[in-house]
């Protein structure tokens, strides 16, 4: 079956951005949302989603003319239009009952060949389709995009044990060849692949930062491009994602995996979130943009001990300065074996990541390569954890893990 027309239900940040990416690929898309009783325009939310996508930075559309491929509507007047769609994706509120109610309505109007998907990042796929027909369950597969979907390559495709393998194959080929995504087939477990391992790494980095007496800016120097990872590193990534989102995801993962490893957030982090310091969305997080007396933008750093923002100037870390200009393999090896608290922090954090990735092999996905790709495509790493272990020498890593207990 060929996907010629799609529908996205939910015109929030993710839903509208996914609709824009479909339009970028030349796929006509129906964008639906609820009716707001206090708005005379019954399509207000869907229209607002398109307008937001048109103004998004970085740009959600390759060309703003692509927005013409998006037809807006609402769930009361336009649900019947789903019968013309080959792929139907939901991106609504993260509440199980809301998703189940939606799928009951969708099943009543969607054509019997349509592929049905959820973009949920935290609600298990198999729970969403309880009570649906066998035919519906056969055509259902999770499709978890990363934000912003035009720029982050990863798409986690999550079948349930009821999903037809041909549906997984057809949809994965569409995602790769038409949408240009990097597909990782994930198991239907908490956090799937990238968030399960990536958020664990962020939480452990926070714990080790406090243990070894480092600052967020120093940690970002150590866990950014020098280590072959995204320029946003650890704490800038947290600010971009939203500290409340990190808190929510980590808390949910901890609750969903009680026998798993430590997803406990530090008290300092909890206090920051409780104060409404949520990252970019609130105007400040671990970092805060401000202007000096000349109107020039400068970045202030949050002092976790005092709770105040400080101008720390350009933060330099000796271990990072020493590897500038060297190839990635040399940088990673030098940082992993560095002396002092910086080296202690990196070894502890990297060893945690290596151990957890190895533990999750066969749990979150059935291929080691998928775990590497999920971190590279979803978090902007140059090397996945298994590729890094190979580069450092697996036996050396095992020796260090055993020494750490």
Region locations from a protein language model:
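N-terminal glycine-rich phosphate-binding loop for ADP-containing cofactors
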Residues: 1-405
């Amino acid at each position: 079956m060929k996907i010629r027309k799609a529908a996205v239900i939910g015109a929030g940040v993710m839903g509208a951005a996914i609709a824009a990416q479909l339009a970028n690929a030349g796929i006509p898309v129906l964008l639906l949302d609820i009716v707001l009783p206090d708005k005379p325009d019954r399509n207000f939310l869907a229209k607002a989603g398109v307008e937001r996508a048109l103004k998004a930075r970085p740009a959600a559309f390759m060309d703003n003319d692509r927005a013409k491929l998006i037809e807006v509507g609402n769930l009361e007047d336009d649900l019947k239009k789903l019968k013309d769609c080959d792929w139907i994706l939901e991106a609504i509120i993260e509440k199980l009952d809301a998703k189940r109610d939606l799928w009951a309505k969708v099943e009543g109007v969607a054509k019997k060949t349509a592929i049905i998907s959820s973009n949920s990042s935290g609600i298990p796929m198999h729970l969403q389709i309880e009570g649906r027909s066998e035919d519906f369950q056969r055509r259902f597969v999770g499709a978890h995009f990363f934000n912003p979907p035009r720029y982050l390559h990863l798409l986690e495709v999550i079948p349930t044990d009821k999903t037809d393998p041909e549906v997984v194959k057809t949809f994965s080929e569409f995602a790769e060849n038409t949408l240009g995504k990097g597909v990782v087939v994930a198991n239907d477990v908490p956090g799937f692949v990238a968030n399960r391992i990536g958020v664990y790494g962020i939480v452990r980095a926070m714990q080790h930062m406090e243990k070894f007496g480092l600052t967020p800016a120093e940690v970002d120097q150590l866990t950014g491009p020098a280590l072959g990872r995204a320029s946003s590193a650890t704490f800038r990534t947290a600010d971009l994602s939203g500290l409340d989102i990190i808190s929510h995801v980590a808390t949910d993962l901890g609750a969903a995996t009680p026998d798993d490893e430590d997803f406990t957030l530090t008290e300092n982090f909890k206090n920051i979130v409780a104060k409404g310091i949520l990252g970019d969305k609130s105007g400040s997080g671990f970092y805060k943009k401000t202007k000096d007396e000349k109107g020039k933008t400068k970045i202030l750093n949050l002092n976790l001990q005092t709770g105040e923002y400080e101008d720390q100037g350009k933060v330099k870390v000796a271990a990072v300065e020493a590897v500038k200009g060297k190839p990635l393999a040399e940088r990673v090896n030098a940082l992993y074996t560095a002396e002092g608290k910086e080296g202690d922090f990196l070894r502890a954090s990297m060893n945690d990541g290596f151990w957890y990735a190895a533990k999750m092999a066969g749990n979150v996905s059935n291929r080691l390569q998928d775990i590497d790709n999920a971190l590279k495509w979803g978090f902007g790493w140059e090397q996945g954890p298994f590729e890094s272990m190979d580069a450092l020498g697996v036996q050396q890593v095992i020796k260090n893990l055993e020494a750490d207990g």
